[in-house]
Swiss-Prot record:
Subcellular localization(s) per the UniProt record: Cytoplasm
EC supergroup of this enzyme: hydrolase
Cellular component per GO, a single term: cytoplasm
GO BP terms in the entry: rRNA processing
Protein name: Endoribonuclease YbeY
Alphabetically ordered keywords of this record: Cytoplasm, Endonuclease, Hydrolase, Metal-binding, Nuclease, Ribosome biogenesis, rRNA processing, Zinc
Family designation: Belongs to the endoribonuclease YbeY family.
UniProt-listed Enzyme Commission number(s): 3.1.-.-
Gene it is expressed from: ybeY
UniProt organism field: Synechococcus sp. (strain RCC307)
Pfam families assigned: YbeY
HAMAP family: Endoribonucl_YbeY
Binding positions (Zn(2+)): 127, 131, 137
Cofactor(s) demanded: Zn(2+)
Length: 160
């Protein structure tokens, strides 16, 4: 197994977090370490900083309307910091951005996808993380590749 990447995690709760901060730090660190070989050089690092926020449908609908002109609830939004970010200073973590997850939407989707709320949150967080790292899904092929990578991350998390 790859060593863990150091991570500074800024958690914000506007809703309950079924996993807890320690588990999120462990998961995100593990995922970032697993993804190192696939990252472009500017994103390869030993340490990262990112935000993870859990909110309700009203809060995510407001963000979705403001940033994507779709004023309705969604499951996860990602706000990448690296698109226009300056070169990171040596010795400091690379700021990736923020992931925002709607707990009520995740609660509705979990049974539809045939798994627990915890598994749905892992899936959504991994999706958000991949977006922060530059992955996107403008077409079916790239969506399939991204979902496959998410599945691998989530399955790896289940083994721990």
């Amino acid at each position: 197994m790859n060593p863990l990447a150091a991570i500074e995690l800024d958690l914000a709760y506007l809703g309950p977090d079924p996993l807890g901060e320690d588990r999120w730090v462990e998961l995100l660190s593990s995922w970032l370490a697993q993804l190192q070989a696939e990252l472009p050089s500017p994103l390869k690092a030993d340490a990262y900083s990112l935000g993870l926020q859990f909110c309700d449908d009203a809060a995510i609908a407001e963000l979705n309307g403001q940033w994507r002109q779709q004023p309705k609830p969604t499951d996860v939004l990602s706000f990448a910091a690296q698109e226009d970010a300056p070169e990171p200073l040596e010795g400091l973590p690379i700021e990736l951005g923020d992931i925002v997850i709607s707990i009520p939407t995740a609660e509705r989707q979990a049974p539809e996808h045939g798994h627990s709320l915890q598994q749905e949150l892992l899936f959504l967080a991994s999706h958000g993380l991949l977006h922060l790292l530059g992955w996107d899904h403008p077409d079916e092929a790239s969506l399939a590749a991204m979902l496959s990578r998410q599945d691998a991350l989530v399955q790896g998390a289940a083994a721990h």
